[in-house]
């Protein structure tokens, strides 16, 4: 029997479901979809903050509302608001005393020190929250979610709105947590943000998972782009018109065969290239087809 870190079974509620999913220890799964798809609500159900109308959430086999299970979950909300007058260290101390099971071996100061290292905030420990930039606020969200050695992290838009360097840094920190067995479910309205992080992707639309699978499989489709000297009167079968010319999924045929089809239609081919379909394209296609 597989020991899942997190399971949601037949979850339904207001503008949500039915949804079922399971997350393995050390797995990073990305939840993507347009605004209003239900990503945040599903994460809040998984965290035990919102009760579903039907279905069940379990954390390491325990019901999510079991106090022991709650100690295993860390949640970082989108646009999380922190008390701005506190220092980073004092804020995390407050959360440690409020939410973490402490003991002689797990003193609040030790938990805070560990969370600061995890999030890369040790140098900012004595800074006031209202002096932090966007990237450090996102790191602070990760620190409070991971505080206390949580084994399941639910991260809502933690990578959104960051420059490439800050995003890469946070992705590396999340990946290191996963390498230690922490299960991560992370949402993003920007699918490209998850392409370097998530091993599995779930596409949400109108509160339902409409497509799911390993990222490598979803991104495995090759697309032929053809640049033309003049726009076509009509594209060949299987091609669609783009700003530069045409494109089509190769879907088992060779590049040579696809280009031969273009030439058979007397199209003025200037150049061509093969690219891999992006996660953003997959999300848009899924949205348009449902």
What are these regions (language model features)?
Residues 32-34:
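The feature captures the beta-strand-to-loop junction immediately N-terminal to the Walker
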Residues 47:
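Helix-to-loop junction immediately C-terminal to a conserved catalytic motif
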Residues 55-69:
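Conserved ABC transporter NBD signature motif
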Residues 79, 86-100:
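Q-loop/switch helix immediately C-terminal to the Walker
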Residues 93, 106-124:
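Conserved ABC ATPase "signature" region
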Residues 171-249:
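ABC transporter nucleotide-binding domain
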Residues 223-286:
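Short, charged/small-residue-rich alpha-helical element at the C-terminal edge
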């Amino acid at each position: 029997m597989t020991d899942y870190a997190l399971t949601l079974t037949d979850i339904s509620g207001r503008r949500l479901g039915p949804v079922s999913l399971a997350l393995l220890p050390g797995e990073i799964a990305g939840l993507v979809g347009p605004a209003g798809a239900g990503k945040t609500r599903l994460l809040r159900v998984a965290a035990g903050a919102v009760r579903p109308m039907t279905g069940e959430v379990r954390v390491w086999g325990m019901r999510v509302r079991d106090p022991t299970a709650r100690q295993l979950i860390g949640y970082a909300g989108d646009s999380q608001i922190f008390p701005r007058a506190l220092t980073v260290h004092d804020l995390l101390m407050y959360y440690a005393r409020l939410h973490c099971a402490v003991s002689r071996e797990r003193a609040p100061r030790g938990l805070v020190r560990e969370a600061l290292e995890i999030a890369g905030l040790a140098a900012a420990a004595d800074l006031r929250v209202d002096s932090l930039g966007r990237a450090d606020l996102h790191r602070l969200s990760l620190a409070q979610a991971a505080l206390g050695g949580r084994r399941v992290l639910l991260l809502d838009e933690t990578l959104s709105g960051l420059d490439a360097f800050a995003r890469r840094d946070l992705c590396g920190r999340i990946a290191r947590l996963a390498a230690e067995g922490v299960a991560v479910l992370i949402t993003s309205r920007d699918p490209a943000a998850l392409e370097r992080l998530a091993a599995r992707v779930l596409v949400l639309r109108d509160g339902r998972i409409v497509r799911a699978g390993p990222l490598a499989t979803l991104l495995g489709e090759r697309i032929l782009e053809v640049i033309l000297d003049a726009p076509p009167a009509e594209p060949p079968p299987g091609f669609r018109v783009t700003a530069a010319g045409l494109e089509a999924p190769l879907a088992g045929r060779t590049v040579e065969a696809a280009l031969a089809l273009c030439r058979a239609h007397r199209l003025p081919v200037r150049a061509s290239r093969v690219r891999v379909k992006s996660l953003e394209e997959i999300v848009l296609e899924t949205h348009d087809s449902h």
